[in-house]
Amino acid sequence: MKKVVPNIFLQEAARLLKDGKPVRLLIDGQSMFPFIRGGKDQVEIVPYDGVSFLPLWSAVFFCWEGQYMIHRYVGTKDGKLLMMGDGNLVRIEVVEPTAVYGILSTIYHSDGSTQDCSDKTWLIRVKWWYRLRSIRRFLIPILKRIID
């Protein structure tokens, strides 16, 4: 059974971010696997103003077609931002910069470890994972057995 977080809860998170306050959320869903494990890992999100430089490969909290989500910023096209989940194989969301409410600053893993989301080594790993998207369908099941 798929568990859906009420959009009103995430709307409140967006409001807090817009007010300049960071938020911490327990992530659900598998679209950011293997870097974020749904139902196990928490993330801290810091506000984003919609106009400042957005680092490539950063994970962001945004609204797309009325749904709030956290996905990876993978590029731009015609002044819009391209987002893709680490666990997604094909779908890329195209959003206005003003639809981004926050940037992930820290991932709190269930084993007690933390990950600084601005760490350069981390972002290089993320970039290589993005480049492997043609074989993700084979890697993800293997990683789920190892990591989950």
Language-model-derived ranges and their functions:
Residues 1-148:
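Extended hydrophobic leader/signal-anchor segments used for secretion and membrane insertion
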